[in-house]
A protein has these predicted regions:
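Outer-membrane beta-barrel "beta-signal"
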Residues: 176, 348-369
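Solvent-exposed loop/turn segments connecting transmembrane beta-strands
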Residues: 65-73, 98-101, 105, 113, ...
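Outer-membrane beta-barrel biogenesis signature
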Residues: 40-71, 281-289, 361-369
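Detector for outer-membrane/organellar transmembrane beta-barrel domains
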Residues: 50-51, 57, 88, 215-313, ...
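N-terminal secretory signal peptides that target proteins for export/translocation
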Residues: 1-24
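Repeated loop/turn-to-beta-strand initiation elements of outer-membrane beta-barrel proteins
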Residues: 87-91, 130-133, 183-188, 220-225, ...
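Outer membrane beta-barrel
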Residues: 46-56, 69-197, 208, 215-222, ...
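Bacterial N-terminal signal peptides
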Residues: 26-40
Length: 369
């Protein structure tokens, strides 16, 4: 994007994710062929009428992001593959095929890279109702946005939170996760993981870290509060921690989420909410409309400006507010639009986004009646 660091760090983050090779795509195709064969063998051992089938689901979308007058076109497909192996084993993976296109500084047609990425590929073993063992490459369970809100169909605003790059998106290793009731009114969920160093392909790298997340869920209030911690086991061996909040009131079509994260790279928070106008009685078409908003703030850490740019972080302390509308055209299809404003010593900027998102689900086998 342009030369101003504040106006370009979001675009650099998208372009950096897009500058990937074909290695992940080749590995994903090989993995798909292998696990589908294994799934068929495992399903053949189950009684007739109880055989689960693989499922291909995911999202697709196209968006236009305008930052301080500079436009970037983004198109992506994010397939998710679920392959059950008997009653206790599950293989799951998510790929990302994304194109990020911009006009060159001197003018001309849009151009840019198209990436094929593998976000995660993991095997889950359901040991009992309270523990699931995960091995492979998985989404790092720090906070809630990366794991629960990242897909374009789920998120209410398409711009990434400013603090998202503070933690690695994926880890390579093993994870234990699960949940259990503490009482009739309180449930506890947890995740504990360890990740090994991976220095092979640029987009399959991971750090040597250990960490965990704990959440307390109150079913009566439909509210969750929790905290995350991560320790780097190499180089500076720094600690990182965060807190999260989620709430969906019983009587209102409202979703509230918030996160705080702190590390040597920076710190900050975001709070967002989305309200579906499904209770409107005067004009039925308004029931398909969702109103969303977010406020957030980022504080620079002790790393250099070049290191911050490489991670996709803002180059200076930044405040941002954003307002958006999502209209659900039909089941599985929505149109989005939003406007935001950034405030920073590096320069203020307007943020516009419009686009459309689609979700799909396809069984990869015959479903028994």
């Amino acid at each position: 994007m342009g030369s101003c660091p504040l106006l370009s760090f979001r675009g650099r983050r998208r372009l950096r994710r897009a500058r990937t090779g074909l290695l992940r795509a080749c590995r994903a195709v090989s993995l798909l062929n292998f696990i589908c064969c294994v799934s068929c063998l495992a399903a053949a051992q189950l009684p007739e009428g109880e055989r689960p089938v693989p499922v291909l689901s995911g999202t697709a979308g196209t968006f236009s992001f305008v930052t301080a007058g500079q436009q970037q076109l983004d198109a992506q497909v994010n397939p998710v593959l679920l392959v059950p192996l008997g009653e206790r084993w599950l293989i799951e993976s998510r790929a990302e095929i994304q194109g990020a296109f911009q006009r060159p500084p001197g003018g001309g047609p849009y151009g840019g890279p198209v990436s094929k990425n593998l976000d995660y590929a993991q095997m889950d073993y359901i040991a009992n109702p309270y523990v699931t063992v995960t091995m492979g490459r998985f989404l790092t369970p720090f906070g809630i946005f990366n794991e629960r809100l990242y897909p374009i169909w789920i998120r209410s605003l398409q711009q990434d939170p400013l603090i998202l790059p503070l933690t690695p998106e994926s880890s390579d290793g093993m994870m234990l996760r699960g949940g259990f009731p503490v009482s009739a009114k309180v449930n506890l969920n947890y995740a504990a993981y360890g990740s090994a160093v991976s220095t092979g392909h640029n987009n399959l790298q991971s750090d040597r870290v250990a960490g965990g997340r704990v959440g307390v869920f109150l079913p009566g209030l439909r509210m969750e509060v929790g905290g995350s911690w991560m320790k780097q086991l190499q180089d500076a061996r720094v600690n990182q921690f965060g807190f999260h909040f989620a709430w969906q009131p019983v009587k209102l079509p409202l979703s509230m989420h918030a996160e705080y994260a702190r590390s040597n790279q920076g710190s900050g928070y975001w709070v967002d909410g989305a309200y579906r106008l499904s209770q409107v009685s005067s004009w039925r078409k308004l029931r398909h409309l969702e109103v969303a908003g977010r406020m957030e703030q980022f504080f620079s850490g002790t790393i250099t400006a070049d290191d911050a740019a490489a991670l996709g972080l803002a180059p200076a302390d930044t405040r941002e507010g954003e307002f958006g509308l999502n209209y659900f055209l039909k089941d599985g299809l929505k149109a989005i639009g939003s406007y935001g404003r950034q405030f920073s010593p590096a320069g203020n900027a307007n943020l516009w986004s419009v686009g459309i998102a689609y979700r799909f689900l396809v069984p990869l086998g015959r479903i028994e009646p």
